[in-house]
Amino acid sequence: SMHMLFSGNPGTAKTTVARLLSQVLKEEEVLKYGHIVECGRQDLVGKYVGWTAQIVESKFQAARGGILFIDEAYSLVEDNRTYGAEAINTIVQEMENYRDEVIVIFAGYPEKMKEFLEQNEGLASRIAFHLNFPDYSPVELTQILDLMLEKSEYRMDERTREKCFSICADACREENYGNGRFVRNLLDHAIMRQADRLIREHQN
């Protein structure tokens, strides 16, 4: 089997890499269709006894020939009052049943994923590949910003670039600052400020 674990903080491109991987595996004829079914706790746990197993089964059915991407799987067991344990047991069973048709990728925070696997040995033994997604450095964040600007057909001068690097460096000192999402929010904020400025100039 090729089931995987992606551990990293939010915004480190885990979902993006999973989507790219699904296309590569389709081209290499490892996967038949190469699509990706993304889900979290709210998509896997039913409200009543017996519902959860059916929901999990339907997700595996939908992912046949592709990847089932389960984000923050540890949240399934964090709330003891729900049917999370039933979801985990069903996932383990379906990983076996669909091992030739579905690749499961579990993703989430490094520490929580480690704990999660320690509590679920049956699950841990079925995961063949562990990929770690480190936080981005200020240089990498600025490079991501450059790519986003290019895609949006914007440019920034060197002075603005230095200011952005400084903002990214400050952000990196914070815990869980958001990585790529932080840069996306920074760019969105800058575009809104620019639009606001242009409207005011036009009115004057």
Task: Label the model's feature ranges.
Residues M2-G34, S58-A62, I127:
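Walker A/P-loop
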Residues M4, V37-C39, L68-F69, V104:
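Hydrophobic positions in the central parallel beta-sheet of the AAA+
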Residues T12, D43-V45, Y74-L76, Y109-K114, ...:
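Conserved nucleotide-binding/hydrolysis micro-motifs of P-loop NTPases
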Residues E28-Y33, E115-E118, A124, F133-Y177, ...:
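Conserved C-terminal "switch" segment of AAA+ ATPases
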Residues K32-H35, G65, Y98-V102, L123-F129, ...:
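Short glycine-/polar-rich loops that comprise or flank the Walker A/P-loop
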Residues Y33-A63, A85:
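Short glycine-rich substrate-engagement loop in P-loop NTPases that contacts/grips substrate
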Residues C39-G40, A63-T82:
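Conserved P-loop NTPase "ATPase switch" module shared by AAA+ and STAND
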Residues Y74-A124:
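Conserved catalytic/switch belt of AAA+ P-loop NTPases
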